[in-house]
């Protein structure tokens, strides 16, 4: 069982262009990736360039807030 103050945390990356266009219902869904990051080395929110299957192109995926 992981400690609550663990350095490595599991985060979710979400497509930024899909979330902006989801208001207008242009795409059928929102692309999400899960990964792990080290809180000590990367204290700020992580952004990565990933492929979005709904936009059919590489877009910036940003870290989203964890919902428990």
UniProtKB/Swiss-Prot annotation:
First-listed, main subcellular location of the protein, grouped into a coarse class: plastid
InterPro entries from the UniProt entry: Ribosomal_bL33, Ribosomal_bL33_CS, Ribosomal_bL33_sf, Ribosomal_zn-bd
GO process terms (BP): translation
GO cellular component term, pick one: ribonucleoprotein complex
GO molecular function, one term: structural constituent of ribosome
Compartmental location: Plastid, Chloroplast
Keyword annotations of the record: Chloroplast, Plastid, Ribonucleoprotein, Ribosomal protein
Pfam family, one: Ribosomal_L33
NCBIfam families in the record: PRK00504.1 (NF001764), PRK00595.1 (NF001860), rpmG_bact (TIGR01023)
Similarity comment text for this entry: Belongs to the bacterial ribosomal protein bL33 family.
Matches recorded under PANTHER family: 50S RIBOSOMAL PROTEIN L33, CHLOROPLASTIC, LARGE RIBOSOMAL SUBUNIT PROTEIN BL33C
Protein name (database record): Large ribosomal subunit protein bL33c
Organism this protein belongs to: Pinus thunbergii
Gene this protein is translated from: rpl33
């Amino acid at each position: 069982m992981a400690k609550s103050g663990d350095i490595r945390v599991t985060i979710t990356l979400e497509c930024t262009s899909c979330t902006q266009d989801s208001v207008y219902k242009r795409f059928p869904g929102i692309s999400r990736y899960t990964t792990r990051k080290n809180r000590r080395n990367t204290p700020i929110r992580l952004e990565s360039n990933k492929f979005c299957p709904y936009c059919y192109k590489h877009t910036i995926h940003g870290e989203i807030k964890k919902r428990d």
